[in-house]
């Protein structure tokens, strides 16, 4: 990967000049000028997904200049470097190969000259065997009962991805009840365990190093809870499995290392649901559905690696995001899935994007002089419409939005889905085109309102419009289409990081707080007054000590 400051490129300067001409252009004008705008600014993927980006403040010239930026920062070489197993995570000296985990073509992918696919396939086969024994009832707990509940204990990438996928694909779930514990707050593990039976519960401890503080604290509490009933530590092996690479620590915990599922340092946490971290997905949905999830992602991988930039969906969405973030000053992006099963999708990519591209140092080690990762947030529609859409429609912040919906519902009750999708279509139309003062006044007049009433209220009912959106319409939410959708966003994030000259696959920003917490924890053991920090931190710790007693 080349280390090029994007803001110093000719393409960036051309975009700045172009922005000056575009900043006051209305989306409504762009549609008026081009009756085929939808056809010109939309694309389909695999007859499963339609991406409509026509309701953006862009023209063909805009896209041409954005593509020039991608070429000048050598995006094609960056894409090739990732797929070739080069160590593009330079600060940790690691390759970045989540694409290998779903490489259904099984073509060789080399790291340090060694094909990783045999090991990937071996772990998949091991997970298949384990999951079939648990799901089929062959795996028994210590009293001979079959497993009814599975608790995944992990945090960050070891929790967010599996939780999101098992929720999104809940229509495909089997009889096993899935639970996810992440927070070190004891309430999370305590409330999860309350209704469970130790004799029929299986725990998955997801920690690559088997040292993650939150995860291991919860794992030891789960083990203590289990042993209160089981009494004998030898029974731990029947009720705990590990998603880890630390065989020594796993064995010391009491887990049979035959039930330890490994992954590799080229798997980043927030890209790990495709790895052994996805064992909870397999236990919930079955191995066949997990394979379909992998296949959908692999299809998007092939699209990303081989499709020209002008038709490459992750590249298109990435470039449009850079356009708003760096030229319009938009600081956030909203992800708005019109599907209740997808209620964790925005939270998943909040981590995926913000932990990846929330960087202020470029690949040369210099402070950046441009915007990098945006703030990601969102909720399912139509809930969001009754919560925060007011600001998106009429506030002073520009919030580009991704609207996501399936054409077919898993729960076709009455006319629920038609009503849901009518809101999906209406919101993007309203955001783009708004409502003028003239239309508002005409509506008031038609309703018999007086001129005074019109003058008094009309200004507050005007919608400026010109709020940009992408619409992503899926045939339905299946393991395959969800896999493709997740990979679409992953590659969008990668593309933006590559162009913006930052390291997308490290996360040093999470480390300082951990270090300080490890220093503070021993200070909380006694009731003595603390004075080793700043006055604020000292004051908070000392008040905590006074109040906890």
UniProtKB/Swiss-Prot annotation:
Query: Which pathway, metabolic or otherwise, does it act in?
Result: Carbohydrate biosynthesis; gluconeogenesis; Carbohydrate degradation; glycolysis; D-glyceraldehyde 3-phosphate and glycerone phosphate from D-glucose: step 2/4
Cellular location(s): Cytoplasm
Name the enzyme group at the top EC level. isomerase
**Enzyme active site:** 355 (proton donor), 386, 514
Specify the domain of life of the species encoding this protein: Bacteria
> InterPro entries recorded for this chain?
G6P_Isomerase, G6P_Isomerase_C, Phosphoglucose_isomerase_CS, SIS_dom_sf, SIS_PGI_1, SIS_PGI_2
Q: Which GO terms describe its cellular component?
A: cytosol
Cross-referenced CDD domains: SIS_PGI_1 (cd05015), SIS_PGI_2 (cd05016)
Statement: the UniProt record of this protein carries the keyword Nucleotidyltransferase: no
**Catalysed conversion reaction:** alpha-D-glucose 6-phosphate = beta-D-fructose 6-phosphate
Q: Per the UniProt entry, what are the Gene Ontology biological process annotations, in alphabetical order?
A: gluconeogenesis; glucose 6-phosphate metabolic process; glycolytic process
Q: Does the keyword Isomerase apply?
A: yes
Q: Which UniProt keywords apply?
A: Cytoplasm, Gluconeogenesis, Glycolysis, Isomerase
Molecular-function GO terms, alphabetical: carbohydrate derivative binding; glucose-6-phosphate isomerase activity; monosaccharide binding
Enzyme Commission number: 5.3.1.9
Q: NCBIfam families annotated for this entry? A: PRK00179.1
The free-text function statement in the UniProt record for this protein reads:
Catalyzes the reversible isomerization of glucose-6-phosphate to fructose-6-phosphate.
Q: Please give the PANTHER family that the UniProt record associates with this protein.
A: GLUCOSE-6-PHOSPHATE ISOMERASE
HAMAP family assigned to the protein according to its UniProt record, in alphabetical order: G6P_isomerase
Write out the similarity annotation. Belongs to the GPI family.
Q: What is this protein called?
A: Glucose-6-phosphate isomerase
Q: What is the lineage of its organism?
A: Bacteria, Pseudomonadati, Pseudomonadota, Gammaproteobacteria, Enterobacterales
Q: Which gene encodes it?
A: pgi
């Amino acid at each position: 990967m080349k280390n090029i400051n994007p803001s110093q490129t000719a393409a960036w300067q051309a975009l700045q000049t172009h922005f000056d001409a575009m900043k006051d252009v209305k989306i409504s004008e762009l549609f008026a000028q081009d009756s085929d705008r939808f056809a010109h600014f939309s694309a389909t993927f695999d007859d499963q997904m339609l991406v409509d980006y026509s309701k953006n403040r862009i023209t063909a010239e805009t896209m041409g200049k954005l593509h020039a930026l991608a070429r000048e920062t050598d995006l094609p070489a960056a894409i090739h470097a990732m797929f070739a197993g080069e160590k593009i995570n330079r600060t940790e000296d690691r390759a970045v190969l989540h694409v290998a985990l779903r490489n259904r073509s099984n073509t060789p992918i080399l790291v340090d000259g060694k094909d990783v696919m045999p090991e990937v396939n071996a772990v998949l086969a091991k997970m298949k065997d384990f999951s079939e024994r648990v799901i089929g009832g062959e795996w028994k707990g210590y009293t001979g009962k079959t497993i009814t509940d599975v608790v995944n204990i992990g945090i960050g990438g070891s929790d967010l991805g599996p939780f999101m996928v098992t929720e999104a694909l809940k229509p495909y779930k089997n009889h096993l009840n899935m639970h996810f514990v992440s927070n070190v707050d004891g309430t999370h593990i305590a409330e999860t365990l309350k209704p469970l039976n130790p004799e029929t519960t299986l725990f998955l401890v997801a920690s690559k190093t088997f040292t993650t503080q939150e995860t291991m604290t919860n794992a030891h509490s789960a083990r203590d809870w289990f042993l209160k009933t089981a009494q004998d530590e030898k029974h731990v092996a029947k009720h705990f499995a590990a998603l880890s690479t630390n065989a020594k620590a796993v064995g010391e915990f009491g887990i049979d290392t035959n039930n330890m599922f490994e992954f590799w340092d080229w798997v980043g946490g927030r890209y790990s649901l495709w790895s052994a971290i996805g064992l909870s997905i397999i236990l919930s949905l079955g191995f066949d559905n997990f394979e379909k999830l992998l296949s959908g992602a692999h299809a998007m991988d092939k699209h990303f690696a081989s499709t020209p930039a002008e038709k490459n969906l992750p590249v298109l969405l990435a470039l449009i995001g850079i356009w708003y973030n760096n030229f319009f000053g938009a600081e956030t992006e909203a992800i708005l899935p019109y599907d209740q099963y997808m209620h964790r999708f925005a939270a998943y990519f909040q981590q995926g994007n913000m932990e990846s591209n929330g960087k202020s140092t470029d690949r040369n080690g210099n402070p950046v002089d441009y915007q990098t990762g945006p703030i990601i947030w969102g909720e399912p529609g139509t809930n969001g419409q009754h919560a925060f859409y007011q600001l998106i429609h009429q506030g002073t912040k520009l919030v580009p939005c991704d609207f996501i919906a399936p054409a077919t519902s898993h729960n076709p009750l009455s006319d629920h889905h038609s009503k849901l999708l009518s809101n999906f279509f209406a919101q993007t139309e309203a955001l783009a085109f708004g409502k003028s003062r003239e239309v508002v006044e005409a509506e008031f007049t038609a309703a018999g309102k007086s001129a005074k009433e019109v003058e008094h209220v009309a200004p507050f009912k005007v919608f400026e419009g010109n709020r940009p959106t992408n619409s992503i319409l899926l045939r339905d939410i299946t393991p395959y289409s969800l896999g493709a959708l997740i990979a679409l966003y992953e590659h969008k994030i990668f593309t933006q990081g590559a162009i913006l000259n930052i390291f997308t696959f490290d996360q040093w920003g999470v480390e300082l707080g951990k270090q300080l917490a490890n220093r503070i924890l021993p200070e909380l053991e006694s009731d003595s007054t603390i004075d080793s920090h700043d006055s604020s931190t000292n004051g908070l710790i000392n008040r905590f000590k006074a109040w906890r007693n």
